Amino acid sequence: MQCDRLWHNARLATLAESRPGLGLVEDGVIAARDGRILHAGPTAEAPSFAARETIDCEGRWITPGLIDCHTHLVFGGDRAQEFEARLAGASYEEIARAGGGIVSTVRATRAASEDDLVAGALRRLDALIAEGVTTVEVKSGYGLSLAAERASLRAARRLGAERDVTVTTTFLGAHALPPEESDRDRFIDRICAEMLPAIAQEGLADAVDAFCEGIAFSPVETARVFEAARDAGLPVKLHADQLSNLGGAALAARFGALSADHLEYTDEAGAAAMAQAGTVAVLLPGAFYFIRETKVPPVDLFRRHGTRIALATDCNPGTSPLTSLLLVLNMGATLFRLTVEECLAGVTREAARALGRLHDLGTLEAGKWCDLAIWDIERPAELVYRMGFNPLHARIRRGR
């Protein structure tokens, strides 16, 4: 059988659900043609391949390329001054209510050119790519006007043209009330009637998100945005239950959301509803750490009900200025007590599920895109165990 590239003498963590645990294969081979995997499994079970190029992995471990399924990479400015205010005792909510927080980034983002937004985002993206990330989700939400949201989403799309990485984009118009607007209902009307339909028609977004929280939007307002997204044919996801329990997890489940994210205050009913709906719990330990939260997401409830768990950086200027998915692995284990298997699945298979891309990403299986990360490690647990450590040997996207 013909193939373009063949990686042999490798150990595989396939993350395939057809295999137990991490889907480990001690003597493995991966064959790819036209960017997709033809075979990923034991050498003894592989067909005879005639490869244009053969790569000896010398016993290294191969995982699926890593997926960062929740980021805000496109923004202007920074929020270092707010960091100092928090160190002096101000809370995230106090800063937001005083006109800082998201709104301060909105001002900086609107003032930046699209080229400047791309340049800043590329620096952050490059840090993720250097650790084996092959797919990244990028949200808007720092424009909060049709023109500025368009510019942010165009900038996000350009990242995929500038770098060898798959970029999925999410319209987060319902992130905060913009500084020029005082009427929440009127702003939600504008999102639903003007912004979201235009962005959907222009193909700038793959999904729609909202921030359902006391300092942002209510469940009723969020539901209006989700109904408009459904009318536009776009899937939804939700920033939910981060600072309080407004029933965001259950709301996300009611709309069949791809994911609900943060979830520190989610209750058992929310966890059960998410499991029933197939909504992935995306946990964001970087934000938990950075704003010094104390309430841990209910991981035991997610396990009990079979809710899938993913991990992501939540890279953003205010609450998680983090561009290391490897550090997120360690944080997920140490802060949230996730297992090694849950952590590694959370940045591969379950992250793909959270983006609605499990059919072609997230595991090493025939038919999926050949996105690989090759590591200089003795065992996969090292990726979770060590900090400040990047053992990436090679990163392959679409077989190249």
UniProtKB/Swiss-Prot annotation:
Enzyme class, broadest EC rank: hydrolase
InterPro entries: Amidohydro-rel (IPR006680), HutI (IPR005920), Metal-dep_hydrolase_composite (IPR011059), Metal_Hydrolase (IPR032466)
Pfam families: Amidohydro_1
Catalysis performed (reactions): 4-imidazolone-5-propanoate + H2O = N-formimidoyl-L-glutamate
Protein residues bound to 4-imidazolone-5-propanoate: R79, Y142, H175, Q242, T319
Cellular localisation: Cytoplasm
Protein name per Swiss-Prot or TrEMBL: Imidazolonepropionase
Species of origin: Methylobacterium nodulans (strain LMG 21967 / CNCM I-2342 / ORS 2060)
Gene field: hutI
